[in-house]
Structure formats: C-alpha cells, structure tokens
C-alpha cells in the first residue's frame, strides 16, 4: 500500500514538473497607447514640438498603393488602423506613421516590414535618412526625417516622445 501511494505521489510530482518545464516564459508585451491614432500623434507632438507645419491623416487600408507608399507595408492583413503625419511643405522630408496591429504579437513583424519597405526618398527631391521604428503593445511608430533638419527634430526625439506617451516603456526599437 505504501509503495502504491509513493508511486502515485512520484507520478504526480513528475507530471507537475513536466508541465512546468513545458511552458516557456513568454516575454510580456506592453499594452500600447490607447485612443485614436491621431490623438496619440497629437500627444507625441505635445512632448516634442517639431516646429513644422504638419497634417495628420488616417490611411485607407484598402488602398494598397497608398499603404505601401506611406508605410512600406505590402498589405494590411495584420493591421487594424494606420495614420500618417507629414510636413505640408514637400521639400521637408518628415514623416511619422502610427500603425495599430490586430494582435500585439505581430507588432515586431509589422515594424520590420515597415523598416525594410518604406521609401525614404518618396519626396523625390529630398531624403529622410534618419529613420527609426519603435513599438509598444499593439502600436508601431515609424518616423523618418532628413538629418539636415536635426536642429528642429530627429527620429530619436520623436521615439523618446512616443516612449513617454506609451508610459515610459517600448517593446522594441529598430533602425537602419
């Protein structure tokens, strides 16, 4: 009887041990900033004034050409919504894009595709050579700016403002 009880206890301990070892600790993803993307963009600009004349627009995710042109994404299958803020003067290479993904697990994948796919010379006569992508939860930020505008704004300053809006933590930052 004692052997049977000991066998059951040992098997129970082994099952618990195997179950605990089988579950890998997943990296906890932050909860992204809440609210409309345009409101998040406004909050970023409250933290870092660019001194540029800017316009913020919600992107039509069904228009794949506009999506690719502005975000570098070839399709919107992982995206819930997107907004862009750009200088009204086309000779100023500045663009801030926020994308909210459907599932925060896909944020870094979307961010990498944005980094690899965005055209930093989309303005033709100027190039945004200072580029960073950052993510917090389900929100991905891409900011690109011409380095000759560094006395006004840099991608690092916008990423830091986004970090502050996101509660002080970012899940990742990518750059070229």
Model features per residue range: what roles?
Residues 1-5, 9-12:
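Positively charged n-region of N-terminal signal peptides that target proteins for export
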Residues 16-20:
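C-terminal motif of bacterial Sec signal peptides marking the signal peptidase cleavage site
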Residues 21-95, 101-176:
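Soluble, non-membrane globular domain cores that form compact, hydrophobic packing
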């Amino acid at each position: 009887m004692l052997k049977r009880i000991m066998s059951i206890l040992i098997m129970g301990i082994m099952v618990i041990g195997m179950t605990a070892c089988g579950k890998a600790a997943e990296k906890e993803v932050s909860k992204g900033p809440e609210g409309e993307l345009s409101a998040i963009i406004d909050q970023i600009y409250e933290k870092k004034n660019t001194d540029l004349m800017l316009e913020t627009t919600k992107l039509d995710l069904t228009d794949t050409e506009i999506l690719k042109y502005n975000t570098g994404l070839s399709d919107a299958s992982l995206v819930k919504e997107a907004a862009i803020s750009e200088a009204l003067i086309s000779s100023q290479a500045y663009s801030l894009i926020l994308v909210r993904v459907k599932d925060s697990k896909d944020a870094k994948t979307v961010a990498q595709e944005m980094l690899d796919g965005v055209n930093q010379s989309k303005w033709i006569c100027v190039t945004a050579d200072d580029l960073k992508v950052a993510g917090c939860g389900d929100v991905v930020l891409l900011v690109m700016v011409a380095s000759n505008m560094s006395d006004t704004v840099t991608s690092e300053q916008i990423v830091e403002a986004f970090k502050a809006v996101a509660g002080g933590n970012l899940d990742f930052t990518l750059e070229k």
